[in-house]
Amino acid sequence: MQTIISDYYQHIYANKMDNLEEMDQFLEKYNPPNLNQEETENLNRPITSMEIEILIKNLPTNKSPGPDGFTGEFYQKFREELTCILLKLFQKIVEEDKLPNTFYEATITLIPKPNKDATKKENNRPMSLMNRDAKILNKIQANRIEQHIKKIIHHDKVGFIPGT
C-alpha cells in the first residue's frame, strides 16, 4: 500500500518542466515590481527575540507535532528558554545561508477527503507535519513579506491574500 501511494504522489508532483526555453523567454521579458531600498532592508533586518516570542505565544495548541515531536504546548511552556535558542539558530541560518536538515523533514500523513471512499488512493490528500522551529521561521518571513505583498503581486492575483 505504501509503495502504491508513494508512486501515485510522485507521479502527480513530478517535475513537469517540458518547455524550459519558453519559460526562459517569458522570464527574460517579464519585469517584476521591485521593492525600494528601505523595504528591502526591512525584509532583511535581523530577526528579533520579540518576533519569536510573539509567535510562540500564538502557536496553535492541540495540533500534531512534526518529526521532532515538539508541540505548540511545549514551545509555550518553555517559551523563554526556546526564544533564546531559536534566536541563535536563526542567526546562524542567516550567517551560514543554510537551513538545518531538520527544516526539510516532515511527517507525511494521508487525510481522507470528506464523503469519499478512503480506500482509493485518489481520495486521500497528503499532509506534511513540519517541526515547529521551521514553522516559526517561515511565519516570521511570511509576516514580513505580507507588509509588501500588495506592491509585489498584481492586483488581479490577490484572491488569497489576507486584507485584499
Regions found by a protein language model. Name each.
Residues P126, G159:
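Short aromatic/hydrophobic contact patches that present stacked aromatics
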Residues M1-E122, S128, R132-I136:
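Surface-exposed loop/turn segments and immediately adjacent short secondary-structure elements
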Residues Q141:
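Active/ligand-binding-proximal structured segments within catalytic/core domains
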